[in-house]
Amino acid sequence: MKRNHRNALLLVTLSACLGLPAEAADRMRAGQWEGTWTGGGRTRATSECVTQAQADAMNGDAGAVRAHLEKIIPAAICKVTNIKVSAGQIDYTSVCAGKENAITTIYHGDRFESTDSGGARSEAKRVGACK
């Protein structure tokens, strides 16, 4: 069960970090993003193509961010709540396997860093067009 919880938390964190472009000038742009996720004593390499459609879907307010997350993260795995969107930051809460986790992601154009209340960290940078 603990491993499933970690995997669910990883899915939520990566999905949020790699798929939440909003206000493109201040946040992520479409393209290939590579980085690392560290949590539970492990570090994993991450790589994801953020499509223009994903970027466009997330260029909105908290409601648009919520709609995108609910589309890519099955409710059976985690529930996403308390989404707050500002120019260069997204904060939200996820509940996975009954455990609440607060996540903060700060965007710097072509890079970001994210932390959560469970101790996980992730960071990534845009490395170019999608592969």
Label each PLM-derived region with a short phrase.
Residues K2-L10:
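Bacterial N-terminal signal peptides that target proteins for export
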Residues L11-V12, A22:
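Cleavable N-terminal signal peptides
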Residues L18-A24:
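Sec/Tat signal peptide C-region and signal peptidase I cleavage site
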Residues M28-T43:
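Tryptophan-anchored aromatic micro-motifs
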Residues E34-W37, D91-A97, E113-S117:
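Short beta-strand segments that buttress and anchor functional surface loops
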Residues R44-T104:
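Central antiparallel beta-sheet cores of small beta-barrel/beta-sandwich binding domains
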Residues T104-T105, R111-A120:
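Short, exposed beta-strand-loop hairpins at the edges of beta-sheets
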Residues S117-K131:
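Edge beta-strand at a domain terminus
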